[in-house]
A protein has these predicted regions:
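Non-catalytic alpha-helical scaffolds and adjoining flexible linkers that form interface surfaces
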Residues: 1-147
Length: 147
């Protein structure tokens, strides 16, 4: 069904790789499962990539690290698409729609790329680097589709 769409296929492989590495064996996590199922059911939508990004943000939260992006909502100006914030000593440039938790009506590859880059950086800084884990290449490949 998705094998003729490299971006969607790459997203599925990426999610499976992240879950395989980050989730403990034999431990059920209903919220992550429900979030994954919701993404799978929505992968045919035009804005599927934003649902993928929100899946990753939710995964970060469910694994014990909430980015608390809504606390930055007062720092957003009307003319800015991105905001630089500091989380646990790391500076991130994040798209405003992630702070508002609202999928943008108009989107570009730049917006998608910066969104994916933000979630990758948080995942790496919180889970992969401290635990000396290899980040999945499939996730980087997905990001490269939006260059």
């Amino acid at each position: 069904l998705y094998f003729n769409d490299k971006e969607r296929t790459s997203a599925l492989i990426s999610i499976c790789s992240l879950l395989n590495i980050l989730l403990p064996d034999s431990q059920p996590n209903k919220k992550i499962y429900d979030s994954f199922e919701k993404f799978i059911n929505s992968i045919n939508l035009e804005n599927w990539i934003f649902l993928y990004i929100f899946f990753e943000i939710n995964l970060i939260k469910e694994l014990g690290f909430d980015t608390n992006l809504t606390e930055y909502s007062n720092n957003i100006g009307d003319d800015k698409n991105f905001l630089k914030i500091k989380i646990d000593g790391y500076i991130y440039e994040i798209p405003n729609y992630l702070i508002h938790k609202k999928i943008p009506e108009n989107f570009t590859n730049l917006l998608i790329r910066k969104s994916l880059y933000f979630s990758r950086q948080v995942i790496q800084n919180k889970f992969f680097i401290p635990n000396n884990l290899l980040f999945p290449k499939s996730r980087i490949i997905l990001e490269n589709y939006f260059n």
